[in-house]
């Protein structure tokens, strides 16, 4: 290991570890020495690392984002959080059963290993994924946008955030009653499933939708630019009529693009009318 200024700083930080945490983010280093056996938290993101040494069995947190890594070593069974975005990773190792958070977006991944039953947060956007394993029942946050996915598995009843933008999806599975955020623009969707009453944010722009299901009373934002929509609600009211009486409900603004006799929604936002 060359002993440049940042390497000296690295060795100094390793020798000074007191709470099990090693933060070497942004250091200009290409390799690491043997790591302390008591290490619990390792942040080596935004470095020039191309390989990691054996990871301590005590490790619970690993951040290696924005590095030159293309392979990860065996992950310790104690690991709870793994952040490996923006690297050249094409395969993930076996994931420990303790894992709660996995961030592996902006990588070369084409498949995911079996997901642990403890997983709560999953970011796998901007990858080559075309199929998903079974989703754990504990999952609350899923971002699988800008992938090759054409179908989603059954969604867990705990899910609150689903982002599946710019995919090959033409249909969505049943949405859980806990969902508050649905982001599905740039897809092949022509119909949406029943929307949960908890939904506060919906983006279905750049889809083939021609009608929306009943909108929840909790909805705060609705983006439906460049769709085939002519009706906002199931009572048959046209967009043009609806926009004339926006203050009767909670509509902040409705942007209308007219094409002859047709109206196309550009953006539709909701807010609490009491704010005026």
Q: Locations of the language-model features?
A:
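Canonical leucine-rich repeat
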Residues: 32-35, 52-55, 72-75, 92-95, ...
């Amino acid at each position: 290991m060359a002993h440049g200024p940042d390497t000296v700083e690295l060795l100094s930080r390793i020798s000074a570890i007191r709470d099990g945490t090693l933060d070497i983010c942004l250091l200009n280093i290409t390799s690491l020495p043997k790591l302390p056996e008591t290490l619990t938290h390792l942040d080596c993101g935004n470095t020039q690392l191309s390989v990691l040494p054996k990871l301590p069995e005590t490790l619970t947190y690993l951040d290696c984002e924005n590095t030159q890594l293309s392979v990860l070593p065996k992950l310790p069974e104690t690991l709870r959080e793994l952040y490996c975005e923006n690297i050249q990773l094409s395969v993930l190792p076996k994931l420990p059963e303790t894992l709660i958070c996995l961030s592996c977006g902006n990588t070369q991944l084409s498949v995911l290993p079996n997901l642990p039953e403890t997983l709560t947060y999953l970011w796998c956007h901007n990858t080559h994924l075309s199929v998903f394993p079974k989703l754990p029942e504990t999952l609350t946050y899923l971002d699988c946008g800008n992938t090759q996915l054409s179908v989603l598995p059954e969604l867990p009843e705990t899910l609150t955030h689903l982002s599946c933008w710019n995919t090959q999806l033409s249909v969505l599975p049943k949405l859980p009653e806990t969902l508050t955020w649905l982001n599905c623009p740039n897809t092949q969707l022509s119909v949406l499933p029943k929307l949960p009453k908890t939904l506060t944010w919906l983006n279905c722009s750049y889809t083939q939708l021609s009608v929306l299901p009943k909108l929840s009373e909790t909805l705060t934002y609705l983006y439906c630019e460049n769709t085939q929509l002519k009706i906002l609600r199931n009572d048959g009211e046209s967009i043009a009529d609806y926009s004339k009486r926006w203050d009767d409900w909670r509509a902040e603004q409705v942007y209308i693009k007219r094409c002859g006799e047709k109206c196309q929604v550009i953006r539709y936002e909701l807010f609490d009318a009491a704010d005026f």
